[in-house]
UniProtKB/Swiss-Prot annotation:
Single annotated GO MF: nickel cation binding
Enzyme Commission numbers on file: 3.5.1.5
Compartmental location: Cytoplasm
Chief site of localization: cytoplasm
Name of this chain's protein: Urease subunit gamma
Subunit field text: Heterotrimer of UreA (gamma), UreB (beta) and UreC (alpha) subunits. Three heterotrimers associate to form the active enzyme.
Matching InterPro entries: Urease_gamma, Urease_gamma/gamma-beta_su, Urease_gamma_sf, Urease_subunit
Catalytic activity: urea + 2 H2O + H(+) = hydrogencarbonate + 2 NH4(+)
Gene3D superfamilies, alphabetized: Urease, gamma-like subunit
Swiss-Prot/TrEMBL keywords: Cytoplasm, Hydrolase
Length: 100
């Protein structure tokens, strides 16, 4: 399997999100990289499904709550930016204050 560096990055995000979701299912609070992975994966998959940038910017802030992450994590993450592939091309999606 020949993957480009971009495809490898997407695969790594996806795998990290899978691990983080398993931890959430067990009731474990997420750390910084796990929270970033879940939200980034949500954006990448939403773009693939045909959702708009505006929809993902709004819904990306509803993926995780403060109760699902370790103390201090929401204050550490002010913005998440993900380059996602939409049906009409690649666009940058920014989610402001993603954990509320």
């Amino acid at each position: 399997m020949n993957l480009s560096p971009r495809e490898k990055d997407k695969l790594l995000i996806s795998m990290a999100a899978i691990v983080a979701r398993r931890r959430l299912d067990r009731g474990v609070k997420l750390n910084h990289p796990e929270a970033i992975a879940i939200i980034s994966d949500f954006i990448l998959e939403g773009a693939r499904d045909g959702r708009t940038v505006a929809e993902l910017m709004q819904s990306g802030a509803q993926v995780l709550t403060r109760d699902q992450v370790m103390p201090g994590i929401p204050e550490m993450i002010h913005d998440i930016q993900v380059e996602a592939t939409f049906p009409d091309g690649t666009k940058l999606v920014t989610v402001h204050e993603p954990i509320r």
